[in-house]
Amino acid sequence: MPTLIVLFNLRDDASVQAYEDWAQTVDVPTVTGLGSVDAFSVHRVSGLFGADSPAPYGYVEVIEVNNLDALVQDVSSEVMAAVSAQFQTFTDAPVFMLAERFAGP
């Protein structure tokens, strides 16, 4: 099962509270409602383990995908286009990485 991992920071002009409220009320419910997605979680990064330097990203999204071709279709819908446009108003240069689990449960 592929996993989409998204790393990002908020834009300087984005409100943390507005983004986190939007993520909980719009982003997560919409994405978890897609037939191609089994699970979706958003994580606030609190720091680098064992280091005093700041983390390079403030947020991480983890999207467990059950069908990558179906996800491509799902994200091209009008609803997801609107959600994506809203996401872009909050985020600064998000990085979308596709990963495959090869070890562990």
What is the predicted role of each segment?
Residues 1-105:
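Macromolecular interaction modules
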